[in-house]
Amino acid sequence: MLPFEAARALVIETLRSRAGVPESRFATAETIDLPRDPRAAIGRILAQDVAADRDYPPFNRSTRDGYAMRSASVAEPGTRLRLVGESRAGVAYPGTIAAGECVRILTGAPLPRGADTVVMQELTQTEGEFVLFEQAARTGQHYVLAGAEARAGEVVIPPGTRLGYAELAVAAEVGQARLKVTRRPRVAIVSTGDELVALDARPGPFQIRNSNGVSLAAQVALVGSEPVLSASAHDEPAELRASIERGLEADLLLLSGGVSVGKYDLVEQTLLDLGAEILFDSVAIRPGRPTVFAWCRGKPVFGLPGNPVSTMVTFELFVAPAIELLSGYLPRPLPLFPAQLAHPIHEKGGMAHFLPARVTWAAAPSDRERAPLTTPVVETLLWEGSGDIGAVARGNCFLLVRESRPQLEAGEWAAVLPRRGVL
């Protein structure tokens, strides 16, 4: 069995070496009209350079409300200068400041010619047409030089960037109204098992609805890809083979169920019959040990366990970085963060455990008298094993218990994996 970190690294390396991602995705770009529909750009991966069309700021820009002047004019506290005009955002003072003069200036306004500093209004008093300065002025205060943020032609957003509101604001600022973004990869989802029925069907006494298909489609969408949800496949070789072949028309194929070692677990053998290379089929985690990663007909294929909590965990660990690469994005490291345990943990060693949990921000159990109310505290939830999706829904994260430290005490720090889209 592979440690989950090694399995995740193998997925990333395989996608990079065999599919040439993320760079190869820039060639299949789509164009988004930003003024028409900025929502369409959120979460997309940029497939071009976005460069500054001029210097930013394009002028020396005040960062405070106050008065602009020559600093030499206020060498001593108590100096009075004649107020000769105003500079505000969008309207510059038209003249040049001379010695003994000052100009009222507002935040975001151009620094007048001749001025080399701005004094905040809190340090002044107005006396008719004069302004009294309570402190001596210093050169270069409270303004930003033209071009300090970006020079004309400088790349301000590189390709491969995931677009959020700040990136879209930068694109708008530099006049990039149309953005090239990578095509969203299509992810085929096939749930397997004779026990599955459609969501709108009434299950028989020993049947269940196909919740895995829905949860996987939601996870695929949260990563920024396009889910293609197929009908479930029965545990029958010919039907499963046909479902896999149809799924290989997408950019990535996800199968859930049928990956263990039972009589009706047919996924791995069917993939081999189709010429697939199995890169791993067992990972040292619980839940999620019987996870398959394969390469078939030039496409990545994942066989995830059928138990729904296993499916959720293994998707985040292994499938999410593959989709990010196919989107043209270098996957981020697994977003673990530390939290203090609300209670002891006693698990078996030999593999890593991902336990449904909830993190809150409160006084830590080891220091409730003095701890600030910002300490993340995590507690696991009662659950009935990897089929208990209700436990995951009641939580907002998974607690990682590493194989090297299966026994943990209350108050110790442990790693938490946030549930995507919730925490």
Spans of model-derived segments:
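Intrinsically disordered, low-complexity, positively charged segments
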Residues: 1-78, 163
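Short glycine-rich, flexible loops that bind phosphorylated cofactors or substrates
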Residues: 112, 165, 261-263, 310, ...
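Short, basic and Ser/Thr-rich N-terminal targeting/leader segments
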Residues: 39, 44, 52, 62-65, ...
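Short, glycine/charged-enriched hinge/interface segments at domain edges or termini
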Residues: 2-5, 50, 65-234, 382-383, ...
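Predominant activation on well-ordered alpha-helical scaffold segments within soluble catalytic domains
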Residues: 8, 12, 65, 121-122, ...
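Flexible glycine/proline-rich
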Residues: 2-8, 22-34, 38-39, 48, ...
